[in-house]
Amino acid sequence: MRRSDGHEETSEFLPMTHSRSVSAASQTSTDSSLSTESLFPREQKPFPNAMGGMALADDDKYRDLEDGEAELSEPFLSSSKKAATGGGRARRIFWILVLLCLGGWLLAFVLFLTGGRANYQTASDALQAHGADSALGSTSTSSGKPVTLQQVLGGQWNPRYHAIGWVAGPNNEDGLLVEKGGDEKQGYLRVDDIRSRKGNNTGRESRVLMRKPIVHVDGQAIVPSNVWPSPDLKKVLLISEQQKNWRHSFTGKYWVFDVDSQTAQPLDPSAPDGRVQLALWSPASDAVVFVRDNNLYLRRLSSDSVVAITKDGGENLFYGVPDWVYEEEVISGNSVTWWSNDAKYIAFFRTNETSVPEFPVQYYISRPSGKKPLPGLENYPDVREIKYPKPGAPNPVVDLQFYDVEKNEVFSVQVADDFADDDRIIIEVLWASEGKILVRSTNRESDILKVYLIDTQSRTGKLVRSEDVAGLDGGWVEPSQSTRFVPADPNNGRPHDGYIDTVPYNGYDHLAYFSPLDNPNALMLTSGEWEVVDAPAAVDLQRGLVYFVGTKEAPTQRHVYRVQLDGSNLNPLTDTSKPGYYDVSFSHGTGYALLTYKGPSIPWQAIINTHGDEITYEDRIEDNAQLTKMVEAYALPTEVYQNVTVDGYTLQVVERRPPHFNPAKKYPVLFYLYGGPGSQTVDRKFTVDFQSYVASSLGYIVVTVDGRGTGFIGRKARCIVRGNLGFYEAHDQIATAKMWAAKSYVDETRMAIWGWSFGGFMTLKTLEQDAGRTFQYGMAVAPVTDWRFYDSIYTERYMHTPQHNPNGYDNSTITDMAALSESVRFLVMHGASDDNVHLQNTLVLIDKLDLSNVENYDVQFYPDSDHSIYFHNAHMMVYHRLSDWLVNAFNGEWHLIAKPVPDESMWERMKRSLRLLSP
């Protein structure tokens, strides 16, 4: 569930970790634009197809029909024939009833036309509304097609982004990038000099690494799914037959490709079919370290043999790769192996899961274990026993070990003042120079940080820095891997090695420079009531410049800045005169960068030159022309960014209004939230997602507020939720909803809330706290319902252990079934094979509802689906269910089924009425 924001979890499916990401909102309520949040999380691929056509057009599917309307004609005709033989009185009654029905139908039809979908505003008009002075936004009489759910799920509204693989040249040249694709003449895999892309410098030609996308080895065709060139660009590491494991991890067959001969061989020639979990180039390009069956191996390219670095890895011991909880909640990746810069040492984790309890995840259709059942056992589910530590249970014991490449020796270094084995979480490892390495660790509850400096040559270590974050502001340490080593360079004013880290400073997260490496006192590079994001992005060692992304302009924006290494001359690289959301990826020497503009207008990407005082644009590599055409053709919602104040805290809000919004009408309102600690959902990225579809096609208002606990609004607002997840967050949702309910254009009797993962928990917690007073409906997907059921590392970071905070866990659990029963109705959906938020959460909730005789809910399970709910078309089904359920809610259908009673047919009611009218 790693989401602390800016990374994972940025779709409606927000895995709970997520991640970290950002953007900035205006300080007024008059700003509207077209930005939204991306539907799909970083590691999540869009649904691979458009899901085909619908059985009914949108107008048919959501058309209001009176119950029984289609069945009226035949009984009516029959009764009229009978009445004809009975005299004029019956005929008069018949025609009176016909006229009444016709009048009712006409009235309903008029109401449908005036209260249904309005004319659609084009995207260009919505873009013009960006500078609107009216707090109500702007409207347009122009027409445009509504956004469809098929488009959203099929990824048609996703911007195109290119990932550039910057590499250093063999002679440390800057501005080189790896590009994949193209014909045989261009080369499938090549290294380009960015300065040659303009076509005015023929002296810098591309170097082709692979001519073809398919490689043949002993008559076998190898189709690589990913490639990694060696640092000297003479070899390429290939992976084929890649299979996903968990969110970030995978296995595959690895091959070493020789550039000169254009031939390949297995990474381990003695075991060509062995599935490898991880492979990493040596900085010297002469060896590859890899993990197979949880053991580390070294392959020197000068030999076909491999050296076993470890031998006892297996089911309970992991070497070089993380276990489930470290992969999900700490590293956000598949590697815990690090080469030293001089290629003399390898650092790696030894993870002991012996004491970690197992949780069974069942699969009823697929067999992800790959095990073929014995004859007669085919009808039993496939069960994966996951070592999954829950709060208060034993955690994996993780140690840092080292391998001396020359001596072929594994060793560890004992450090005084280290955390105990059961109280240690290693969150970052960073090699410095001359065999020195920095290690950042926290205690189990993630509120004490310790930084150690280890010398692998002398095999000694010491504590160099410690921070009691809980004592500072009641907060926690968020795991990150963005610390940067800054080597000594006396000629450039750096007499000692140092590093740049992100630290809490006056209530916000800022950049600090520590030098020498053992200096506990920092030189602050940034300060103020704003925060840096995953910083620093890069360090220019020649000019002493630090590049970073920050929220200096507003919490919902991201701009790129640079500052001198002494903390002076902080300046933006991007245009801060208007709202923007940028990301950046720098070349090896920081002379060039890939600048990505993500919103609020149409996203684009460009290569920039940072050598001078002013940046220059080298090449525009993506302008999303197709997306521009779609924006012009479709009626996107107008987005109004504003702030609200709740209990003295300023919170960011975005309101998505239907096209051609009419303030004289009354609109239903859907609140969408995630709300996890450090996350962000209100930002200035261009996004067309499920919320956009709801506003554009269904005609409802969608509101999102980032309440207390979320990121980039200061540590005071963020840390207040610690130990009591859900309380302040739900309070802020309800308080904001009450503000919207009081607006003249809102129908306060039709308000709903929905979310996924942590957002699912927040949906239920909000309904529980609200008890039907503000929200009538809710939709929770893959929710946590009791934090004792989630994983230990994430949960204890924000809740402490259950032993230290039993009341907090009780308060955060969904327990008040009577309060939930006050809602009109709510929906809960869950993947039956969710390895992240276990199905246990929803099943225990259902049991509580049963025991309390609560029936005002619907539930849906998806077999073999994990937290993202994708298996066998499930992702499409989830969103169609959400859409249909919401329409039924706002159409009043759930009121009709609250207390069902048998009903006689209309024909029987008619006959009874006629008898009563007879003399």
Curated annotation (Swiss-Prot):
Q: What is its main location?
A: membrane
Mind listing the UniProt keywords for this protein, alphabetically? Answer: Aminopeptidase, Glycoprotein, Hydrolase, Membrane, Protease, Serine protease, Signal-anchor, Transmembrane, Transmembrane helix, Vacuole
GO MF terms on file? aminopeptidase activity; dipeptidyl-peptidase activity; serine-type peptidase activity
InterPro entries linked to this entry? AB_hydrolase_fold, Peptidase_S9_cat, Peptidase_S9B_N, Serine_Prot_S9B/DPPIV
Q: Name one GO biological process term.
A: proteolysis
List the biased-composition ranges (Basic and acidic residues).
1-10
Where does the source fall among the domains of life? Eukaryota
Q: Catalytic residues per the record?
A: 757 (charge relay system), 834 (charge relay system), 867 (charge relay system)
EC number of this enzyme: 3.4.14.5
For the protein in the UniProt heading, the enzyme class is hydrolase
Q: Which family does it belong to?
A: Belongs to the peptidase S9B family.
Q: What does this protein do?
A: Type IV dipeptidyl-peptidase which removes N-terminal dipeptides sequentially from polypeptides having unsubstituted N-termini provided that the penultimate residue is proline.
Its protein name is Probable dipeptidyl-aminopeptidase B
